Curated annotation (Swiss-Prot):
Any single Pfam family the record assigns to this protein: POR
pH dependence: Optimum pH is 9.0.
Catalytic function, reaction form: 2 oxidized [2Fe-2S]-[ferredoxin] + 2-oxoglutarate + CoA = succinyl-CoA + 2 reduced [2Fe-2S]-[ferredoxin] + CO2 + H(+)
Bilayer-crossing regions: none
Taxonomic superkingdom: Archaea
Gene: korC
Keyword tags: Oxidoreductase
Protein's UniProt name: 2-oxoglutarate synthase subunit KorC
Matches recorded under InterPro entries: 2-oxoglutarate_synth_KorC (IPR052554), PorC_KorC (IPR011894), Pyrv/ketoisovalerate_OxRed_cat (IPR019752), Pyrv_flavodox_OxRed_cen (IPR002869)
Organism (species): Methanothermobacter marburgensis (strain ATCC BAA-927 / DSM 2133 / JCM 14651 / NBRC 100331 / OCM 82 / Marburg) (Methanobacterium thermoautotrophicum)
SUPFAM superfamilies given in the database record: Pyruvate-ferredoxin oxidoreductase, PFOR, domain III
Gene Ontology terms for molecular function: 2-oxoglutarate synthase activity
Self-association and partners: Heterotetramer of the KorA, KorB, KorC and KorD subunits.
Phylogenetic lineage: Archaea, Methanobacteriati, Methanobacteriota, Methanomada group, Methanobacteria
């Protein structure tokens, strides 16, 4: 089993931390192999940001994501930039408040994409009180929608990765993201 995951958005959304959490969840807590890479523009906030994670039950011979099984798009620009790379039959998770969904309906149908809506920024604000944890809302949605890492592993990785004193809010955001999928944000 090899799963390629790309999480993309813009600087300031916590895309890189989301990738780190996912990689740690797989490798440290689920006993899988994982490689995480990242890229971002020169801007501190607002520029393009991308984290990629390869998860496998075997040693990973090539660490780059070429055709992701899972794409998490936290901005419309990220969606437009990376959606064509998504494997046919893959999984697409978007923040519907940040993308123009009617522009991708044909793509989703033609490529037989499993499509999930996770209004991460709004959910972070409404359920946790701060938008900065929108990335953990997306990790919760990703975990629930795909099962690529276990809930326990994701929670442990979050606790191990976020700044001290913010663990509870980040776990709340993670749970809120899971609930979005359980409640049928499809």
């Amino acid at each position: 089993m090899r799963k390629e995951i790309r999480i993309a958005g813009f600087g300031g959304q916590g895309v890189i931390l989301a990738g780190i959490v996912l990689g740690k969840a797989a490798s440290l807590y689920d006993g899988l192999y994982a490689v995480q890479t990242q890229s971002y523009g020169p801007e501190a906030r607002g520029g393009a940001s991308r984290a990629e994670v390869v998860i496998s039950d075997e040693e990973i011979d090539y660490p780059k994501v070429q055709s992701p099984d899972i794409l998490v798009a936290m901005s419309h620009q990220a969606l437009l930039t990376y959606m064509d790379d998504l494997k046919a039959g893959g999984t697409l998770i978007v923040d519907p408040d940040m993308v123009i969904e009617n522009e991708i309906q044909d793509f989703v149908e033609e490529r037989n994409i499993s499509y999930f809506r996770a209004p991460a920024t709004r959910t972070a604000e409404e359920k946790v009180g701060i938008t900065i944890v929108a990335n953990m809302v997306m990790i919760g949605a990703l975990t629930e929608a795909t099962g690529v890492v276990s809930v326990r592993a994701a929670e442990e990785a979050i606790k191990n990765s976020v700044p001290p004193g913010t663990e509870e809010k980040n776990i709340m955001a993670f749970q809120a993201g899971r609930e979005l999928i359980m409640e049928g944000q499809k």
